[in-house]
């Protein structure tokens, strides 16, 4: 095992940079809370240091269709020097280091794993504190969830049916960056309808004797 994963995972042959690392943790929050699944398009932009390596500055935008709970929306990921603007000085982005900003019609929510700050547009008269029934389930913790699943057969919160789609979603950003173009995404068939040339980045042909079925 070679340590320093934040170095070697920036080479495409060995990893997928922060999109394959912290994005799985941070994008999980809006992906879970807003019931996101497969995007309709993805536009990944970055300033690569070298064709073989993950860019040092990244911005990726996915478009998600509406569902019965919410309208369509854009989800944008930033890493490196490029950062989103903050709607107010109340939000100290640099003090957080990393987090998620939800921007809605009536206000904003800035959150990470331990902190949540709400700022409303206008006064507070239209604000109703969420009821307990409106909250997403809390995790028991990785180890307790695993034991609970073994004993009851119940799925873990981040089971493969969920996490597989989340990782697929994030990796589409890496494919878009490497393609240098916005991709129109057909999730059912796992292909970019406007860029057949990226198929080798989506499906890998394994050497004879090394086959992965799935």
Residue locations for each model-derived region?
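Contiguous beta-strand/loop segments that form the cofactor/metal-binding neighborhood of enzyme cores
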Residues: 1-161, 165-214
């Amino acid at each position: 095992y070679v340590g320093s994963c934040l170095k070697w995972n920036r080479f495409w042959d060995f990893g997928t940079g922060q999109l394959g690392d912290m994005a799985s943790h941070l994008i999980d929050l809006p992906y879970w809370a807003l019931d996101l699944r497969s995007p309709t398009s993805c536009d990944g932009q970055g300033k690569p240091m070298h064709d073989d390596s993950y860019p040092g500055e990244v911005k990726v935008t996915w478009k998600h269709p509406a569902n019965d709970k919410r309208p369509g929306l854009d989800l944008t990921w930033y890493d490196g020097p490029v950062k989103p603007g903050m709607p107010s000085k109340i939000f100290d982005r640099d003090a957080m280091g990393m987090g998620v900003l939800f921007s809605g019609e009536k206000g904003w929510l800035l959150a990470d794993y331990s902190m949540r700050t709400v700022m409303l547009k206008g006064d507070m008269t239209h604000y109703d504190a969420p009821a307990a029934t409106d909250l997403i389930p809390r995790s028991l913790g990785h180890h307790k969830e695993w034991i609970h699943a073994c004993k009851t057969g119940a799925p873990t919160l981040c089971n493969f049916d969920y996490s597989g789609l989340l990782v697929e979603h994030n990796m589409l950003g890496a494919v878009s960056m490497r393609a240098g173009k916005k991709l129109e995404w057909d999730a059912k068939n796992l292909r970019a309808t406007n860029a057949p040339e990226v198929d080798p980045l989506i499906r890998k042909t394994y050497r004879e004797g090394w086959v992965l079925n799935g």
